């Protein structure tokens, strides 16, 4: 049998490293959380962790943006935010993205008699705001060099953000920390087509990156 391999990403600087550096008595870190919350449940746990940190006064969730399209993705995020007592967190959805199926998002439609089991106001993703304008508005209203953007999915929101008019200057002024869980930034098997390169090469703020190692097994 030919050797197979896994790519294992080892996070030298975690997506939550901005909060990890929090000092007692400091102001909560303003967070914009960008997620591909559709297929895997890990992003649900990551958002739940952010809410727990917000409960402890370590961060403030300014907004959540979604980088994959599913009719129920924004509804699920709204239900999760509501469950943790923050129903008014703005939610943005990326534009012109392919639709993705999900095995768990349908939970948001479950009802107990005539009410949603998990209360929420956003009933379909199309009701949510557009991701890039939302991020820019949140940054405009933030203090200088205060915001941490945490991307734990595709770069389908951050890449167009960097290309938006005035976005580079806005990011440089408002963002203190950009933490990206992304893919490869260099040529792999002759393939150079990676959206993450836009974030690495053209982002004017601190960007923790994860290293990738290849492990072989038989």
What are the language-model segments listed below?
Residues 7-15:
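Bacterial N-terminal signal peptides
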Residues 18-218:
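N-terminal acidic, glycine/proline-rich low-complexity segments
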Residues 1-5:
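Positively charged n-region of N-terminal signal peptides that target proteins for export
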